[in-house]
């Protein structure tokens, strides 16, 4: 399993951002094999974690047309900067 970590410094968010973010989450979960998605924001920082079975699914998601457009909008309007990290999950356990 893999996790994609998206960390951003927010410039300004608007109503379109909320719509686009909800659509991207829906697409990732329903059509591209994203297993789980969590996002939090505090002040001008945003962090999103998405979990995936394989890197092929991540690459397909990254190259999808709607997602590419959302990335362009993010760079142009919503984010000052961002970092994307892809990591392999070595161990996963929970309680209870």
Predicted regions and their residues:
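Short S/T/G/P-rich N-terminal loop/turn motif that feeds into the first structured element of a domain
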Residues: 1-47, 55-63, 79-96
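Sensory beta-strand/linker motifs that couple input domains to effectors
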Residues: 51
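Residues that form generic nucleotide/phosphate-binding pockets
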Residues: 27, 70-73
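Short arginine-rich
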Residues: 72-74, 78-80
């Amino acid at each position: 399993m893999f996790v994609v970590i998206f960390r951003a410094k927010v410039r300004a968010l608007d109503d379109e951002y909320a719509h686009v973010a909800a659509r991207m989450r829906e697409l990732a979960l329903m059509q591209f094999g994203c297993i789980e998605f969590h996002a939090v924001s505090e002040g001008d920082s945003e962090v999103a974690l998405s979990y995936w079975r394989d890197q092929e699914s991540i690459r397909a998601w990254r190259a999808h047309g709607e997602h590419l457009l959302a990335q362009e909008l993010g760079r142009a309007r919503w984010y000052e900067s961002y970092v994307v990290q892809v990591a392999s999950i070595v161990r996963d356990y929970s309680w209870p």
